[in-house]
Curated annotation (Swiss-Prot):
UniProt keyword annotations, A-Z: Cell membrane, Cell wall biogenesis/degradation, Cellulose biosynthesis, Coiled coil, Glycosyltransferase, Manganese, Membrane, Metal-binding, Transferase, Transmembrane, Transmembrane helix, Zinc, Zinc-finger
Single GO biological process annotation from the record: cellulose biosynthetic process
Protein role: Probable catalytic subunit of cellulose synthase terminal complexes ('rosettes'), required for beta-1,4-glucan microfibril crystallization, a major mechanism of the cell wall formation.
UniProt protein name: Probable cellulose synthase A catalytic subunit 2 [UDP-forming]
Organism: Oryza sativa subsp. japonica (Rice)
Gene symbol of the encoding locus: CESA2
Family matches, as InterPro entries: Cellulose_synth, CES_Znf_RING, Nucleotide-diphossugar_trans, Znf_RING/FYVE/PHD
Named cofactor requirement(s): Mn(2+); Zn(2+)
Length: 1073
């Protein structure tokens, strides 16, 4: 019965409540071809003639259907009403069905989410809210700060007047305690909705005018003026030219692609093709012309060159069609955030992860949190979750101090629109801070705020100093109870809400975004999956407490540098034509505190400004681990809406035949049968959730229970969380109480929650590699999602990078080990996901991302070859003719031309490009090499490698003191050895040439060039070994002496100074020989 009712929703006009009716061809009338929002013919005609001319739901301009009179602004081809949308957007009936299931699963009697039955009743009563984020449609339960035994700031639900009144503040020095597993006992329920009667009045007025009368304000009606044409605009309507221009602007796209100009990209592509041809000819020459007296060296070099060619192809061709993108924040504001109206922007949950406060200073994390709380976004749409995977009381106390300082910092940022909104970096700027500031009070307020921040730093640093010495009995909280996280490997889950709608106001009486501390449960014997497990715990907690439609994840040292960063992302995610197919929006990583020359290529500009822009022209950039805004639906393992193919050229010329109902059903069945072509790419469709229920209706409790069990098997044993996954536009159940939500939040971060579920395999951050970001993005792309690369003029986020050589190499080692783990796993892009929706060149990029550490082996051999050639007097290339030399010269010219043209279209400087080339060699013969062997040990022998968190401590000993600090690590051994070998080889080669005469200098130049190529690439490494005072550390001196001794013995064995002249045997020739 209810299933039939859900199907009938599409037959009822959502404006006036009348039947939708049929079109001229006898089928159901569809006003909007994009979203299918049910509107009857009279309402459609009224909207086109006297209204906004756009769909009330998706804001798409209405096309003229057959039989409709033309109006001003109609396009010449707007007469075909049969054009289908590119995307199968869900209809209102389907959405209603999903939310009914969600509510029934939770309480069997709930009304929440975007329920079209409720919407219909609102229309009947003259109250219509926004279909997505209106407060009456998708309620957002506000969890107050939770203490150890009670809920502070409880909001009674007896009267609507008290719904939003915050009660009780956290004292300045009296820090709250986290909720562990104590059940508070409040009960409250939110109700109410926002709406207006504008649509109802306008539609009623149009109908009365159509009958010959115009309604007046007092309810009476008058006859229309005689002689007025049907197409004239009535003077009584509120439609005017300004509204027309405004509505036209809201229908414009929120972003657009900006292709690279043909004058820059076409020469680049031509050189790539020419380089590929030259490379093939060069390899053919090398293979067919062996060196007879140095066959092993020749064979080794040819194998290395073939591998380099393959690696170049995998890296180069995904950059074939790079693009830029532009966003239009003014259009976003016109469509979703008009001044004086409730904001309709989507809610966003922001995740910040930290582990060790000794290596990730609390002050750094505090600056990140403060920049989030001060972001330019509606406060009721932002929630910040801080994951403390180390369960440190220091982090908890520092977060409490941060929440207090935020009450002063946030209003200061918003009052004067300062950038950036991380106080440490704002006050450290060496700029004219009075520029563009017209308020007379700014200087005074800025001075006072700087003083407040210095006091805040003193308090936080005092906490850090106190935490250096851990008491024998463990840390004690202010109420005398032991800190639950004293044992970091065995502690319960903890949640504390510091800020929010009932957690106190700022100094100007405004609400602050929600700030939540989360530490997931840890017990011995359970696999916790490091950062990926912590992120999945945050996904579940946020779904239970706030359920924002989108998620932003940041490392604790990456602060928001552009306060409009979330709005930039919403220009893609909330775009009606693009957003539903986007799994995430990735921002480039930018860094502070890097030396001017960027000695170790920390900025990684080539990757962020060239490679990722190239991928954006395909299926989108890879996920790089931070600065990424996710679509929550994509993280839940669902597939994107299916994009239908447009009719072909000949069918459009001949006129496409309209599909009958039978043919439509047939094609639908065909699509369903071919939907899961490859069993290795599991994809879930939102429509699959209703399986077993649609046929029997909601009265069949058994079918509903079976569906709930299947969902709990996938998402875990939490009815509240399962219900939240069905709410496509976010929000939490309206009838849920803070007590029940808190219990569920504690439950979903328990260490055994993920057992026998799809978490980490198909849902959330994917397990199986220390670089969980690559796996997570790859799974989404394999399901058919696309990602977006957003590069605003002002960098969205900035972070810190390890400028010390040893720390930098350890960071690269971790990334490379993750790639090796993926290479030997079932998720390897070489064989995973065929038959899915991953584009061919996108697969190329992922293959390159996983196999690049293997390049370290041929690179190491190729760097040793120059020294061997110089010491033995042999070479890897035979004596070449003038014709053969053309191909060598052509290859070198094509390599340089590719780099130059790449820098030309991307804007990357030659110094950045060269630093990237140098560190490719340094990292390749050190970190990548170790990663290959450690990965093989882990896969074959099960020997796991533990990694320490990269230190993010601030530089307190002077500018770039960390850069010159020498930290010994085994990763330094291979580059040091290769450097010494080549230097010895150069000396030996020159000595041999001096003693052998003029004719030996010709072949020597090729060998010396080869050796200097290696030494020049290792020059930053050599500077790193020398330190600030250009004094080589003792350990390096010892290694140099040891290696020099080895090669001295080798030198004596070869003895290049001995004259090697062969002649006749004197015993055979005699004295007259």
């Amino acid at each position: 019965m209810d299933g039939a009712k859900s199907g009938k929703q599409c037959h009822v006009c959502q404006i006036c409540g009348d039947g939708v009716g049929t079109a001229a061809d006898g089928e159901l009338f569809t006003a909007c071809d994009v979203c299918g929002f049910p509107v009857c013919r009279p309402c459609y005609e009224y909207e086109r003639k006297d209204g906004s001319q756009a769909c009330p739901q998706c804001k798409t301009k209405y096309k003229r259907h057959k039989g409709s009179p033309p109006i001003l602004g109609d396009e010449s081809d707007d007469v075909d009403a049969d054009d289908a949308s590119d995307v199968n957007y869900p209809t209102s009936g389907n959405q209603d069905h999903k939310h009914k299931i969600a509510e029934r699963m939770l309480t069997w009697r709930m009304n929440s989410g975007r329920n079209d039955d409720i919407v219909h009743s609102k229309y009947d009563s003259g109250e219509i809210g926004h279909p997505k984020y209106d407060s009456g449609e998708i309620p957002r339960i506000y969890i107050p700060s939770l203490t150890h035994s009670q809920i502070s700031g409880e909001i009674p639900g007896a009267s609507p007047d008290h719904m939003m009144s915050p009660v009780g503040n956290i004292g300045r020095r009296g820090h709250p305690f986290p909720y562990v597993n104590h059940s508070p006992n409040p009960s409250r329920e939110f109700s109410g909705s926002l709406g207006n009667v504008a649509w109802k009045e306008r539609v009623d007025g149009w109908k009365m005018k159509d009958k010959g009368a115009i309604p007046m304000a007092n309810g009476t009606s008058i006859a229309p003026s005689e002689g007025r044409g049907v197409g004239d605009i009535d003077a009584s309507t509120d439609y005017n030219m300004e509204d027309a221009l405004l509505n036209d602007e809201t229908r414009q796209p929120l972003s657009r692609k900006v292709p690279i100009s043909s004058s820059r990209i076409n020469p680049y592509r031509m050189v790539i093709v020419l380089r590929l041809i030259v490379l093939c000819i060069f390899l053919h020459y090398r293979i067919t012309n062996p060196v007879r007296n140095a066959y092993p060296l020749w064979l080794l070099s040819v194998i290395c060159e073939i591998w380099f060619a393959l690696s170049w192809i995998l890296d180069q061709f995904p950059k074939w069609s790079p693009i830029n993108r532009e966003t239009y924040l003014d259009r976003l504001a016109l469509r979703y955030d008009r001044e004086g109206e409730p904001s309709q922007l989507a809610p966003v949950d922001i995740f910040v992860s930290t582990v060790d406060p000794m290596k990730e200073p609390p002050l750094v994390t505090a600056n990140t949190v403060l920049s989030i709380l001060a972001v330019d976004y509606p406060v009721d749409k932002v929630s910040c979750y801080v994951s403390d995977d180390g369960a440190a009381m220091l982090t908890f106390d520092a977060l409490a101090e941060t929440s207090e300082f935020a009450r002063k910092w946030v209003p200061f940022c918003k009052k004067y629109s300062i950038e950036p909104r991380a106080p440490e970096w704002y006050f450290a700027q060496k700029i004219d801070y009075l520029k563009d500031k017209v308020q007379a009070s700014f200087v005074k307020d800025r001075r006072a705020m700087k003083r407040e921040y210095e006091e805040f730093k003193v308090r936080v640093n005092a906490l850090v100093a106190k935490a250096q010495k851990v008491p024998e009995e463990g840390w004690i909280m202010q109420d005398g109870t032991p800190w639950p996280g004293n044992n970091t490997r065995d502690h319960p889950g903890m949640i504390q809400v510091f800020l929010g709608h009932s957690g106190g106001l700022d100094t100007e009486g405004n609400e602050l975004p929600r700030l939540v501390y989360v530490s997931r449960e840890k017990r011995p014997g359970f696999q916790h999956h490091k950062k990926a497990g912590a992120m999945n715990a945050l996904v579940r907690v946020s779904a239970v407490l706030t359920n924002g439609q989108y998620l932003l994840n940041l490392d604790c040292d990456h602060y928001i540098n552009n306060s409009k960063a979330l709005r930039e992302a919403m220009c893609f995610l909330m775009d009606p034509n693009l957003g539903r197919r986007v799994c995430y929006v990735q921002f480039p990583q930018r860094f502070d505190g890097i030396d001017r020359n960027d000695r170790y290529a920390n900025r990684n500009t080539v990757f962020f400004d060239i490679n990722l822009r190239g991928l954006d022209g395909l299926q989108g950039p890879v996920y790089v681990g931070t600065g990424c805004v996710f679509n929550r639906t994509a993280l839940y393992g669902y597939e994107p809406p299916i994009k239908q193919k447009r009719p072909g050229y000949f069918s459009s010329l001949c006129g496409g035949r309209k599909k009958t109902k039978k043919s439509k059903e047939k094609s639908t069945e065909k699509k369903k049968s071919h939907k899961h072509v490859d069993s290795s790419v599991p994809v879930f469709n939102l429509e699959d959730i209703e399986e077993g229920i649609e046929g029997s209706g909601f009265d069949d409790e058994k079918s509903l229970l079976m569906s709930q069990m299947s969902l709990e098997k996938r998402f875990g044993q939490s009815s509240v969380f399962v219900a939240s996954t069905l709410m496509e536009y976010g929000g939490v159940p309206q009838s849920a109480t803070p007590e029940s939500l808190l219990k569920e939040a504690i439950h979903v971060i328990s260490c055994g929650y993920e057992d026998k579920s799809d978490w980490g395999t198909e849902i959330g951050w994917i397990y199986g590699s220390v670089t969980e970001d690559i796996l997570t993005g790859f799974k989404m792309h394999a399901r058919g999602w696309r990602s977006i690369y957003c590069m605003p003029k002002r960098p969205a986020f900035k972070g810190s990078a390890p400028i010390n050589l040893s720390d930098r190499l350890n960071q690269v080692l971790r990334w490379a080990l993750g790639s090796v783990e993926i290479l030997f796993s079932r998720h390897c892009p070489i064989w995973y996901g065929y038959g899915g929706r991953l584009k061919f060149l996108e697969r190329f990029a992922y293959i390159n991302t996983t196999i690049y550490p293997l390049t370290s082996i041929p690179l190491l051999l190729y760097c040793i070859l120059p020294a061997i050639c110089l010491l033995t007097g042999k070479f890897i290339i035979p004596e070449i003719s003038n014709f053969a030399s053309i191909w060598f010269i052509s290859l070198f010219l094509s390599i340089f031309a590719t780099g130059i043209l790449e820098m030309r279209w991307s804007g990357v400087g030659i110094d950045e490009w060269w630093r990237n080339e140098q560190f490719w060699v340094i990292g390749g013969i050190s970190a990548h090499l170790f990663a290959v062997f450690q990965g093989l040990l882990k896969v074959l022998a099960g020997i796991d490698t533990s990694f320490t968190v990269t230190s993010k401590a601030s530089d307190e000993e002077g500018d770039f003191a960390e850069l010159y600090m020498f930290k010994w690590t085994t990763l330094l051994i291979p580059p040091t050895t290769i450097l010494i070998i080549n230097l010895v080889g150069v000396v030996a080669g020159i000595s041999y040439a001096i003693n052998s005469g003029y004719q030996s200098w010709g072949p020597l130049f090729g060998k010396l060039f080869f050796a200097f190529w290696v030494i020049v690439h290792l020059y930053p490494f050599l500077k790193g070994l020398m330190g600030r005072q250009n004094r080589t550390p003792t350990i390096v001196v010892v290694w140099a002496i040891l290696l020099a001794s080895i090669f001295s013995l080798l030198w004596v064995r070869i003895d290049p100074f001995t004259t090697r002249v062969t002649g006749p045997d004197t015993q055979k020739c005699g004295i007259n020989c």
